[in-house]
Protein backbone atom coordinates (compact mmCIF):
# COMPACT_ATOMS: atom_id res chain seq x y z
CA UNK A 1 0.00 0.00 0.00
CA UNK A 2 1.30 3.47 -0.89
CA UNK A 3 0.56 7.04 0.03
CA UNK A 4 0.54 8.64 -3.41
CA UNK A 5 1.47 12.10 -2.09
CA UNK A 6 5.14 11.10 -2.38
CA UNK A 7 6.58 10.12 -5.76
CA UNK A 8 10.29 9.56 -6.21
CA UNK A 9 12.30 8.21 -9.10
CA UNK A 10 15.60 6.81 -10.32
CA UNK A 11 16.57 7.90 -13.82
CA UNK A 12 19.78 6.33 -15.15
CA UNK A 13 21.21 6.86 -18.62
CA UNK A 14 22.05 3.68 -20.57
CA UNK A 15 25.69 4.62 -21.12
CA UNK A 16 26.86 1.53 -19.24
CA UNK A 17 26.01 -0.84 -16.40
CA UNK A 18 25.22 0.37 -12.89
CA UNK A 19 28.18 0.65 -10.51
CA UNK A 20 28.44 1.29 -6.76
CA UNK A 21 27.89 5.04 -7.21
CA UNK A 22 24.74 4.33 -9.22
CA UNK A 23 23.55 2.01 -6.46
CA UNK A 24 23.93 4.79 -3.89
CA UNK A 25 21.59 7.01 -5.93
CA UNK A 26 19.14 4.19 -6.63
CA UNK A 27 19.07 2.90 -3.05
CA UNK A 28 18.85 6.36 -1.50
CA UNK A 29 15.92 7.38 -3.69
CA UNK A 30 14.23 4.01 -3.14
CA UNK A 31 14.52 4.17 0.66
CA UNK A 32 13.40 7.80 0.82
CA UNK A 33 10.26 6.89 -1.15
CA UNK A 34 9.47 3.62 0.61
CA UNK A 35 10.04 5.10 4.08
CA UNK A 36 7.20 7.51 3.29
CA UNK A 37 5.06 4.74 1.80
CA UNK A 38 5.41 6.51 -1.50
CA UNK A 39 5.78 5.54 -5.13
CA UNK A 40 9.20 4.86 -6.67
CA UNK A 41 9.47 5.08 -10.44
CA UNK A 42 12.23 4.20 -12.88
CA UNK A 43 12.93 6.20 -16.03
CA UNK A 44 15.55 5.37 -18.66
CA UNK A 45 17.09 8.59 -19.96
CA UNK A 46 17.96 7.40 -23.45
CA UNK A 47 17.92 10.69 -25.36
CA UNK A 48 21.60 10.81 -26.30
CA UNK A 49 22.20 7.87 -28.68
CA UNK A 50 25.91 8.59 -29.28
CA UNK A 51 26.59 7.98 -25.55
CA UNK A 52 24.43 4.87 -25.20
CA UNK A 53 25.81 1.35 -24.95
CA UNK A 54 23.76 -1.33 -26.74
CA UNK A 55 21.96 -3.53 -24.22
CA UNK A 56 22.81 -1.29 -21.25
CA UNK A 57 19.20 -0.32 -20.53
CA UNK A 58 18.06 -3.92 -20.22
CA UNK A 59 21.09 -4.70 -18.05
CA UNK A 60 20.31 -1.77 -15.74
CA UNK A 61 16.76 -3.00 -15.19
CA UNK A 62 18.02 -6.52 -14.45
CA UNK A 63 20.56 -5.09 -11.98
CA UNK A 64 17.86 -3.17 -10.12
CA UNK A 65 15.73 -6.28 -9.85
CA UNK A 66 18.72 -8.37 -8.75
CA UNK A 67 19.32 -5.91 -5.90
CA UNK A 68 15.67 -6.03 -4.87
CA UNK A 69 14.89 -2.49 -6.02
CA UNK A 70 11.51 -3.09 -7.63
CA UNK A 71 9.80 -0.05 -9.11
CA UNK A 72 6.14 0.93 -9.39
CA UNK A 73 4.33 1.09 -12.71
CA UNK A 74 5.87 0.97 -16.17
CA UNK A 75 9.38 2.12 -16.96
CA UNK A 76 9.33 5.47 -18.79
CA UNK A 77 11.68 5.71 -21.77
CA UNK A 78 12.77 9.17 -22.84
CA UNK A 79 13.27 7.91 -26.39
CA UNK A 80 9.47 7.53 -26.54
CA UNK A 81 8.81 11.04 -25.24
CA UNK A 82 10.00 13.16 -28.16
CA UNK A 83 6.52 14.49 -28.93
CA UNK A 84 6.17 15.80 -25.36
CA UNK A 85 9.53 17.57 -25.66
CA UNK A 86 8.55 19.07 -29.02
CA UNK A 87 5.31 20.36 -27.49
CA UNK A 88 7.24 21.93 -24.61
CA UNK A 89 9.66 23.60 -27.04
CA UNK A 90 6.77 24.88 -29.16
CA UNK A 91 5.02 26.35 -26.12
CA UNK A 92 8.15 28.17 -24.99
CA UNK A 93 8.64 29.53 -28.51
CA UNK A 94 5.02 30.71 -28.73
CA UNK A 95 5.39 32.50 -25.39
CA UNK A 96 8.57 34.24 -26.54
CA UNK A 97 10.58 32.37 -23.92
CA UNK A 98 13.18 30.81 -26.23
CA UNK A 99 15.28 31.71 -29.25
CA UNK A 100 17.57 30.19 -31.86
CA UNK A 101 21.30 30.48 -31.38
CA UNK A 102 24.00 29.88 -34.01
CA UNK A 103 27.01 30.71 -31.83
CA UNK A 104 29.75 28.07 -32.16
CA UNK A 105 31.11 26.39 -29.08
CA UNK A 106 34.50 28.02 -29.67
CA UNK A 107 32.98 31.48 -29.21
CA UNK A 108 31.42 30.52 -25.88
CA UNK A 109 34.70 28.99 -24.75
CA UNK A 110 36.43 32.30 -25.48
CA UNK A 111 33.85 33.95 -23.21
CA UNK A 112 34.88 31.67 -20.36
CA UNK A 113 32.14 29.09 -20.89
CA UNK A 114 29.14 31.26 -19.96
CA UNK A 115 26.92 32.36 -22.84
CA UNK A 116 26.39 36.13 -23.15
CA UNK A 117 22.99 36.20 -24.89
CA UNK A 118 24.47 37.26 -28.24
CA UNK A 119 21.64 35.78 -30.34
CA UNK A 120 18.79 36.86 -28.05
CA UNK A 121 17.62 39.69 -30.33
CA UNK A 122 18.93 38.48 -33.71
CA UNK A 123 15.84 36.54 -34.85
CA UNK A 124 17.67 33.55 -36.32
CA UNK A 125 15.74 30.69 -37.93
CA UNK A 126 16.04 27.03 -36.93
CA UNK A 127 18.60 26.11 -39.60
CA UNK A 128 21.83 24.86 -38.00
CA UNK A 129 20.83 26.43 -34.70
CA UNK A 130 20.40 25.40 -31.09
CA UNK A 131 17.46 26.61 -29.01
CA UNK A 132 18.16 28.54 -25.83
CA UNK A 133 15.82 29.49 -23.02
CA UNK A 134 15.24 33.22 -22.71
CA UNK A 135 15.98 33.37 -19.01
CA UNK A 136 13.19 35.17 -17.16
CA UNK A 137 13.35 33.54 -13.74
CA UNK A 138 16.96 32.91 -12.69
CA UNK A 139 17.12 30.82 -9.50
CA UNK A 140 19.97 31.95 -7.26
CA UNK A 141 19.52 29.38 -4.50
CA UNK A 142 17.40 26.40 -3.55
CA UNK A 143 16.68 24.24 -0.51
CA UNK A 144 18.12 20.74 -0.34
CA UNK A 145 16.48 18.51 2.29
CA UNK A 146 19.90 17.09 3.21
CA UNK A 147 22.24 20.04 2.66
CA UNK A 148 20.08 23.04 3.47
CA UNK A 149 20.24 26.23 1.39
CA UNK A 150 22.49 25.92 -1.67
CA UNK A 151 23.70 29.07 -3.40
CA UNK A 152 24.12 29.08 -7.17
CA UNK A 153 26.81 30.73 -9.23
CA UNK A 154 25.07 33.96 -10.38
CA UNK A 155 26.44 33.79 -13.92
CA UNK A 156 25.42 30.18 -14.36
CA UNK A 157 21.96 30.81 -12.89
CA UNK A 158 21.33 33.77 -15.22
CA UNK A 159 22.59 32.12 -18.41
CA UNK A 160 20.31 31.46 -21.39
CA UNK A 161 21.10 27.74 -21.49
CA UNK A 162 20.46 25.31 -24.35
CA UNK A 163 17.21 23.31 -24.34
CA UNK A 164 17.50 21.82 -27.85
CA UNK A 165 20.87 21.02 -29.32
CA UNK A 166 22.15 22.00 -32.74
CA UNK A 167 22.46 18.30 -33.64
CA UNK A 168 18.71 17.85 -33.11
CA UNK A 169 18.88 16.14 -29.71
CA UNK A 170 16.81 17.38 -26.78
CA UNK A 171 18.84 18.83 -23.94
CA UNK A 172 18.92 16.98 -20.62
CA UNK A 173 17.53 19.89 -18.60
CA UNK A 174 14.42 20.19 -20.76
CA UNK A 175 13.71 16.46 -20.91
CA UNK A 176 14.19 15.86 -17.19
CA UNK A 177 11.84 18.70 -16.21
CA UNK A 178 9.14 17.69 -18.69
CA UNK A 179 9.29 14.07 -17.53
CA UNK A 180 9.45 14.74 -13.80
CA UNK A 181 6.38 16.95 -14.18
CA UNK A 182 4.62 14.32 -16.30
CA UNK A 183 5.34 11.60 -13.74
CA UNK A 184 4.23 13.77 -10.82
CA UNK A 185 7.59 13.49 -9.06
CA UNK A 186 7.45 15.28 -5.70
CA UNK A 187 11.07 14.83 -4.62
CA UNK A 188 14.23 14.06 -6.58
CA UNK A 189 16.93 12.13 -4.74
CA UNK A 190 20.15 11.90 -6.77
CA UNK A 191 23.91 12.35 -6.63
CA UNK A 192 25.66 15.56 -5.66
CA UNK A 193 27.19 15.80 -9.14
CA UNK A 194 23.78 17.09 -10.26
CA UNK A 195 23.61 20.02 -7.84
CA UNK A 196 24.80 22.50 -10.47
CA UNK A 197 22.04 21.93 -13.08
CA UNK A 198 19.32 22.06 -10.41
CA UNK A 199 18.96 25.84 -10.63
CA UNK A 200 18.50 25.59 -14.40
CA UNK A 201 15.82 22.97 -13.94
CA UNK A 202 14.08 25.07 -11.30
CA UNK A 203 14.08 28.05 -13.65
CA UNK A 204 12.37 25.90 -16.28
CA UNK A 205 9.66 24.98 -13.78
CA UNK A 206 9.09 28.71 -13.32
CA UNK A 207 9.02 29.31 -17.08
CA UNK A 208 6.37 26.61 -17.52
CA UNK A 209 4.43 27.67 -14.43
CA UNK A 210 4.74 24.21 -12.89
CA UNK A 211 5.19 23.28 -9.26
CA UNK A 212 8.78 22.19 -8.65
CA UNK A 213 9.74 19.05 -6.70
CA UNK A 214 11.96 18.98 -3.65
CA UNK A 215 15.60 17.93 -3.92
CA UNK A 216 18.05 15.72 -2.06
CA UNK A 217 21.63 15.38 -3.30
CA UNK A 218 23.43 12.35 -1.92
CA UNK A 219 27.20 12.08 -1.36
CA UNK A 220 29.30 10.78 -4.24
CA UNK A 221 31.26 7.55 -4.12
CA UNK A 222 34.90 8.01 -5.14
CA UNK A 223 37.60 5.71 -6.44
CA UNK A 224 41.05 5.39 -4.87
CA UNK A 225 42.28 8.39 -6.87
CA UNK A 226 39.52 10.59 -5.44
CA UNK A 227 37.54 10.76 -8.69
CA UNK A 228 33.80 10.18 -8.83
CA UNK A 229 32.83 6.61 -9.70
CA UNK A 230 31.36 6.86 -13.17
CA UNK A 231 30.91 4.93 -16.36
CA UNK A 232 33.30 7.36 -18.05
CA UNK A 233 36.19 6.44 -15.74
CA UNK A 234 35.40 2.72 -16.03
CA UNK A 235 33.94 2.12 -12.57
CA UNK A 236 33.40 -1.63 -12.12
CA UNK A 237 29.85 -2.85 -12.65
CA UNK A 238 27.83 -4.05 -9.68
CA UNK A 239 28.58 -7.62 -8.65
CA UNK A 240 26.24 -10.22 -10.07
CA UNK A 241 26.54 -12.56 -7.08
CA UNK A 242 24.94 -12.18 -3.66
CA UNK A 243 23.63 -8.58 -3.55
CA UNK A 244 23.34 -8.45 0.24
CA UNK A 245 26.96 -7.55 1.16
CA UNK A 246 26.94 -4.79 -1.46
CA UNK A 247 23.64 -3.44 -0.13
CA UNK A 248 25.10 -3.46 3.39
CA UNK A 249 28.12 -1.49 2.14
CA UNK A 250 25.79 0.99 0.45
CA UNK A 251 23.76 1.43 3.62
CA UNK A 252 26.94 2.10 5.60
CA UNK A 253 28.05 4.59 2.96
CA UNK A 254 24.71 6.36 3.46
CA UNK A 255 25.28 6.51 7.22
CA UNK A 256 22.45 4.14 8.06
CA UNK A 257 22.04 1.78 10.99
CA UNK A 258 24.30 -1.25 10.69
CA UNK A 259 22.51 -4.46 9.77
CA UNK A 260 24.18 -6.87 12.19
CA UNK A 261 22.45 -10.10 11.15
CA UNK A 262 22.20 -9.46 7.40
CA UNK A 263 23.56 -12.95 6.59
CA UNK A 264 20.37 -14.39 8.05
CA UNK A 265 18.13 -12.13 5.98
CA UNK A 266 16.85 -12.40 2.43
CA UNK A 267 17.33 -9.41 0.12
CA UNK A 268 13.68 -8.47 0.70
CA UNK A 269 14.07 -8.66 4.49
CA UNK A 270 17.26 -6.61 4.36
CA UNK A 271 15.54 -3.87 2.37
CA UNK A 272 12.51 -3.91 4.67
CA UNK A 273 14.88 -3.39 7.60
CA UNK A 274 16.58 -0.54 5.74
CA UNK A 275 13.25 1.14 4.97
CA UNK A 276 12.07 0.83 8.59
CA UNK A 277 15.29 2.42 9.90
CA UNK A 278 15.93 4.95 7.11
CA UNK A 279 17.09 8.35 8.40
CA UNK A 280 17.89 11.03 5.86
CA UNK A 281 19.46 13.12 8.61
CA UNK A 282 22.12 10.42 9.09
CA UNK A 283 23.32 10.62 5.49
CA UNK A 284 26.72 12.36 5.23
CA UNK A 285 27.11 15.29 2.85
CA UNK A 286 30.75 14.76 1.89
CA UNK A 287 31.94 12.40 -0.84
CA UNK A 288 33.77 9.28 0.25
CA UNK A 289 35.75 6.38 -1.17
CA UNK A 290 33.77 3.31 -2.16
CA UNK A 291 34.05 0.91 0.83
CA UNK A 292 35.17 -1.85 -1.54
CA UNK A 293 38.34 0.15 -2.26
CA UNK A 294 38.84 1.02 1.41
CA UNK A 295 38.50 -2.60 2.50
CA UNK A 296 40.84 -3.80 -0.24
CA UNK A 297 43.60 -1.47 0.93
CA UNK A 298 43.52 -2.68 4.54
From Swiss-Prot:
Binding site for Zn(2+): 101, 103, 115, 119
Note on how the cofactor is bound: Binds 1 zinc ion per subunit.
Covalent S-S links between cysteines: none
Gene3D superfamilies: HUPs (3.40.50.620)
Enzyme class: ligase
Pfam families given in the database record: tRNA-synt_1c
Any one GO biological process: tRNA modification
Annotated binding of L-glutamate, by residue: 9-13, 45, 172, 190
Record-listed ATP binding positions: 231
GO MF, one annotated term: ATP binding
UniProt keyword annotation of Nucleotide-binding present: yes
Cofactor(s) needed for function: Zn(2+)
Position of sequence motif 'HIGH' region: 12-22
HAMAP family in UniProt: Glu_Q_tRNA_synth
PANTHER family: GLUTAMATE--TRNA LIGASE, GLUTAMYL-Q TRNA(ASP) SYNTHETASE
The protein's role, per its UniProt record: Catalyzes the tRNA-independent activation of glutamate in presence of ATP and the subsequent transfer of glutamate onto a tRNA(Asp). Glutamate is transferred on the 2-amino-5-(4,5-dihydroxy-2-cyclopenten-1-yl) moiety of the queuosine in the wobble position of the QUC anticodon.
Family designation: Belongs to the class-I aminoacyl-tRNA synthetase family. GluQ subfamily.
Protein name: Glutamyl-Q tRNA(Asp) synthetase
Organism: Salmonella typhimurium (strain LT2 / SGSC1412 / ATCC 700720)
